[in-house]
């Protein structure tokens, strides 16, 4: 449920902020990550792409209630040219290559290990971000619409 996911996210963000510089952009004024730099929500369409692109690591944590599909944030991060570190979701693994186009983690310890690794390995991190940016292009509206129209024609 949403409450449990909120607690998990807060715990993960606190664990990150205990070791690393962390900026959090949120519309949730009640969220307080003590050691993080908290930012108010900014315009998702005009300003967030720049944040995604300029951040060393962008974290995606899918709601527990989402058992299939992919958060739009994954596409947005990759589309902006950002490096995406996301919790493991089977559907993400079907569409993107872990460790080549984005990076997935399975638990808090795995996430912290991967954060440390990719902060220390900038060239590898940047190559993964570039590969992710290239990979997400196949999901443009034109390509998806073409796929849907072909699928409809076959049925």
Residue ranges and their predicted role:
Residues 45, 49, 71, 126:
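Glycine-rich phosphate-binding loop at the start of an alpha helix
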Residues 111, 124, 128, 144-148:
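Hydrophobic alpha-helical packing elements
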Residues 49, 72-79, 93:
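Short alpha-helical segment that forms part of, or immediately flanks, the ligand-binding pocket
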């Amino acid at each position: 449920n949403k409450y449990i996911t909120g607690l998990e996210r807060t715990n993960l963000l606190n664990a990150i902020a205990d070791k690393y510089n962390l900026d959090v952009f949120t519309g949730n004024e009640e969220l307080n990550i003590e050691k993080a730099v908290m930012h108010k929500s900014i315009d998702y369409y005009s300003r967030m792409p720049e944040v995604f692109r300029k951040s060393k690591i962008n974290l995606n944590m899918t709601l527990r209630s989402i058992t299939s599909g992919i958060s739009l944030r994954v596409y947005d991060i990759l589309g902006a040219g950002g490096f995406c570190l996301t919790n493991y979701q089977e559907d993400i693994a079907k569409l993107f290559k872990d460790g080549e186009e984005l990076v997935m983690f399975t638990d808090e310890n795995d996430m912290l290990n991967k954060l440390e690794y990719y902060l220390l390995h900038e060239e590898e991190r940047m190559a993964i971000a570039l590969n992710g940016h290239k990979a997400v292009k196949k999901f443009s509206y034109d390509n998806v619409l073409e796929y849907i129209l072909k699928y409809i024609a076959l049925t």
